[in-house]
Swiss-Prot record:
GO terms for cellular component: cytoplasm. It comes from Yersinia enterocolitica serotype O:8 / biotype 1B (strain NCTC 13174 / 8081). The active site is at residue 117. It catalyses: a 2'-deoxyribonucleoside 5'-diphosphate + ATP = a 2'-deoxyribonucleoside 5'-triphosphate + ADP; a ribonucleoside 5'-diphosphate + ATP = a ribonucleoside 5'-triphosphate + ADP. The gene is ndk. This is Nucleoside diphosphate kinase.
Amino acid sequence: MAVERTFSIIKPNAVAKNNIGAIYARFESAGFKIIAAKMLHLTKEQAEGFYAEHKGRPFFDGLVEFMTSGPVMIQVLEGENAVQRHRDIMGATNPDNALAGTLRADFADSFTENAVHGSDAVESAQREIAYFFSENEICPR
C-alpha cells in the first residue's frame, strides 16, 4: 500500500466539547502521523470557498454557518491508504448510520454537526491540504 496524505477537520462542535485530544489519540493509535495542524476560526469566505462544490445545495448555508460558529482544528494526516482509512475511522456522514466506535458515532451531534471532515479522494486531499497549508507548514516525520 502507498503512503498517502489526507486532510482532516475537527468541527466546531467537537472542539467546543474538548474532544481534540481524544480524536488525535484515535488518529495516532490508528497509525497516522499528524504532520501539520492548526486551530482556526473560519471566516465565511474561507468556509464558502472550501465547500464551494456544495454551493446551491439545500444544506450549504447551514453548513457554512455551522463551520464558522467556532474554532476548528485542521490537520494533515499521513499513513498507508490514509484517505480510505481516515474515512473508515470517521464513520458514516450521518451519525445515526455510523458504526459504534467510529468518530461520528462517538462525537457527532447531528448530520451537520458530525464532528469531523475528511477528504474523499487523494485528489481532493491534495486540493484541501493546499487550501489551508503552505508546503513549509507540513512537517513529514
